[in-house]
Curated annotation (Swiss-Prot):
The keyword Protein biosynthesis does not apply. It catalyses: NAD(+) + (deoxyribonucleotide)n-3'-hydroxyl + 5'-phospho-(deoxyribonucleotide)m = (deoxyribonucleotide)n+m + AMP + beta-nicotinamide D-nucleotide. GO terms for cellular component: cytosol. This is DNA ligase. NAD(+) binds at D34, S35, E36, Y37, D38, S83, L84, E114, R137, E176, K293, K317. One of its GO terms (molecular function) is metal ion binding. Its cofactor is Mg(2+); Mn(2+). Zn(2+) binds at C411, C414, C429, C435. The keyword RNA-binding does not apply. Pfam families: BRCT, DNA_ligase_aden, DNA_ligase_OB, DNA_ligase_ZBD, HHH_2, Nlig-Ia. The active site is at K116. DNA ligase that catalyzes the formation of phosphodiester linkages between 5'-phosphoryl and 3'-hydroxyl groups in double-stranded DNA using NAD as a coenzyme and as the energy source for the reaction. It is essential for DNA replication and repair of damaged DNA. It comes from Acinetobacter baumannii (strain ATCC 17978 / DSM 105126 / CIP 53.77 / LMG 1025 / NCDC KC755 / 5377).
Length: 678
């Protein structure tokens, strides 16, 4: 058979299978029988086996399997994957609507209602219609590259097709990966038959499947992808509503959740909620509520965002599922900052698809409020079907020997005195960095990516080093090279892994003052506050010497945080650890000029492909000068930095008269402020 004829036959089969996949998975209207579909699939596979050099990139047979990975790479989301706010009752729902409508005076508001799928949110990138990347939500800012695994999901298009619409140059689609109930039941039956561990619920099964380093395992699992939104589209799709956007996605080959409703009032939204709640048991997928969105995309833009969630959408959760059990014990756990948290150990009980045996009681005040005692019968429920919580204590079932719970006087880990300042709800161990419980959490935080970024020093290493008494505090990390022979004796730690660890520790010594401050794990000091402190005080010595009043003048530092920072630097054992860290060689570039925040409060946007720097580098330079980097252009945008292939954001900037800067000019501007690529 001629090569051109083979390719033509392959293309015909691929297009035919894609058409039937769309009819089956997206439209839920199969046009051929399973046996006919299998015949087409095997016909294509036979051709590919005969002519492996001609296999097409978008062939459905290439979706399954691949080489196992050693780890997942981190990816920064260009547009953050924000979470949704929650409402749990009609009163909260109506309050959400009031807030929306107050910000949109004299405008008609329609609401798009969708099922809130109980799966894992991911982001898919398509370039010229071809899937190039799949990324987990992660912390909303950074996720993990799971491209090889998402390519194994059968209903997920690898190449976009549409007879009606032009395929965009760049498209980022957000959606949920989950395991339908029927597939979950079959998977568990197969696991049980093989004598292997079963999964507690479909969400756990889906999560476990996506997290497999070997894509062949993911390929064998019955996963499905449901699209729920568009993060980026270049050129702009020109659609005006959420409802139309979802229909547009189906035209491109994506499956969306089986129910969407366009509601003209919030009262109609409530009616749909009650309807969906009744239909929940009959759905093919697990849901934990519904998502309510303002339908008009222009109105969404007007409403904007809070720090972690959009103002134009909320999740309306179903009532939590509850069960009765007994409190067997109440233990006190010590966290990274020394906070003592009471944890109720329960007689294990099955609630909402998972077995619950531990529930946090938050603080001694919550124990007193509930009047919970060891031996009590309690109602346990899962907030939003996720976080277990004690809802109620049943005193009528209380045994005579039930024990009242008191706040311990000394730390259960290091025996240091427990302190609880007047007016605070949380008790703390006063042992600081010498408390073993605080130590392990402090070390985990210290080595994390956004702190000192010591690659390879994970939990297994940390636990082994603590057992061997090689880590008493974070400063000991920088003396591990003195114990090379001991390190080589740790199980599964060979010459290469030990050398890699030592090299990573050495590399981490060159850092920034902001990262170092963040790494110290001072209570109330996150990344942004650490950056503000570094910009304000410029040197560690100046920060250590600062009093509460000086600290309070720092942007992003409130009265309480100022006291926490001052207390940290007044503790002798903390100063001792700091001195040892500096003596070990941790350093950063000295400030070359007084602190400047020339872009303070400005909103900047990055778009297109940057060739001379990464988006992370550009973002860090802007943030160092006080600017905020946004994922969208608005009238409040100060400037747009445009790389190659910039699309809709550039068009919008032109419409609004927002200044646009190319990459070279941006780097020149940054250099003028003392910001250069490192």
């Amino acid at each position: 058979m001629a090569i051109t004829s083979v390719i033509e036959q392959m293309r015909q089969l691929i297009q035919l299978i894609a058409k039937h996949n769309h009819a089956y998975y997206v439209m839920d209207q199969p046009t051929i029988s399973d046996s006919e579909y299998d015949h087409l699939f095997h016909q294509l596979k036979a051709l590919e086996e005969q002519y492996p050099e001609l296999v097409q990139a978008d062939s459905p047979t290439t979706k399954v399997g691949g080489q196992a990975l050693s780890k997942f790479e981190s990816v920064t989301h260009v547009v953050p994957m924000l979470s949704l706010g929650n409402v749990f009752n009609q009163e909260d729902l109506f309050a959400f609507a009031r807030r929306v409508e107050e910000r949109l005076p004299n405008q008609k508001v329609q609401y798009e209602v969708e099922l809130k799928l109980d799966g894992l949110a991911i982001s898919l990138w398509y370039e010229n219609g071809v899937l190039v990347r799949g990324v987990t939500r992660g912390d909303g800012e950074t996720g993990e590259d799971i491209t090889q695994n998402v390519k194994t999901i059968r209903n997920l298009p690898k190449v976009l097709h549409s007879e009606k619409y032009e395929i965009p140059r760049l498209l980022e689609v957000r959606g949920e990966v989950l395991m339908p109930k029927s597939g979950f039941e079959k998977l568990n039956a197969d696991q049980e038959a093989k004598g292997e561990k079963t999964f507690a619920n479909p969400r756990n099964a889906a999560a476990g499947s996506l997290r497999q380093l070997d894509p062949n395992i993911a390929a064998a699992r019955p996963l499905a992808f449901y699209a729920y939104g568009i993060a980026q589209c270049e050129p702009n799709h020109g659609l005006t509503t959420m409802h139309d956007s979802l229909q547009w996605l189906t035209e491109l080959g994506f499956q969306i959740a089986e129910r969407q409703y366009l509601c003209n009032s919030i009262q109609e939204v409530q009616q749909r909620y009650e309807q969906i709640q009744q239909e929940r048991p009959n759905l093919q997928v697990e849901i934990d509520g519904m998502v309510v969105k303002v339908d008009d995309l222009k109105q969404q833009q007007q409403l904007g965002f809070l720090s972690r969630e959009p103002r134009w959408a909320t999740a309306y959760k179903f009532p939590a599922q509850a069960a009765l059990t007994t409190v067997e014990q109440i233990d006190w756990q010590v966290g990274r900052t020394g906070t003592l948290t009471p944890v109720a150990r329960l007689n294990p009980v099955f609630v909402g698809g998972v077995t619950v045996s531990n529930v946090t009681l938050h603080n001694i005040g919550e124990i007193h409020r509930l009047d919970v005692r060891i031996g009590d019968t309690v109602s346990v429920y899962r907030t939003g079907d996720v976080i277990p919580k004690v809802e109620k204590v049943w005193p009528e079932f209380r045994p005579a020997e039930a024990e009242v719970v008191h706040l311990p006087e000394s730390c259960p880990v290091c025996a240091s005195p427990v302190v609880m300042p007047e007016g605070e709800a949380l008790a703390r161990c006063s042992g600081g960095l010498y408390c073993a419980a605080q130590r392990i959490e402090a070390i985990r935080h210290f080595v994390s990516r956004k702190a000192m970024d010591i690659e390879g020093l994970g939990d297994r290493w940390v636990e082994s080093l603590l057992r061997l008494d090689l880590l008493k505090d974070v400063a000991d990390i920088y003396h591990l090279h003195e114990h090379r022979e001991t390190l080589l004796g740790i199980e599964k730690m060979g010459e290469k892994s030990v050398q890699n660890l030592i090299d990573a520790i050495e590399a981490s010594k060159k850092t920034t003052l902001a990262r170092f401050i963040y790494a110290l794990g001072i209570r109330g000091v996150g990344e942004t506050t650490a950056r503000m402190l570094a910009n304000t005080f410029q040197t560690l010595e100046a920060l250590k010497a600062a009093n509460v009043e000086a600290l309070k003048k720092t942007p992003d530092v409130g009265d309480i945080t100022a006291e926490w920072i001052a207390d940290f630097f007044l503790a002798p054992h903390n100063i001792e650890v700091l001195d040892r860290l500096i003596a070990a060689g941790i350093h950063w570039d000295a400030p070359t000029a007084p602190t400047r925040q020339p872009l303070n409060g400005e909103s900047w946007v990055l778009t297109g492909t940057l060739e001379q720097m990464t988006r992370d580098q550009a973002t860090q330079m802007l943030q160092a000068l006080g600017a905020r980097v946004s994922g969208s252009v608005s009238s409040k945008t100060k400037c747009v930095v445009a790389g190659e292939k910039a699309g809709s954001k550039l068009e919008k900037a032109a419409k609004l008269g927002i200044p646009v800067m190319n990459e070279t000019d941006f780097l020149s501007l940054m250099a003028g402020y003392g910001q250069t690529l490192s």
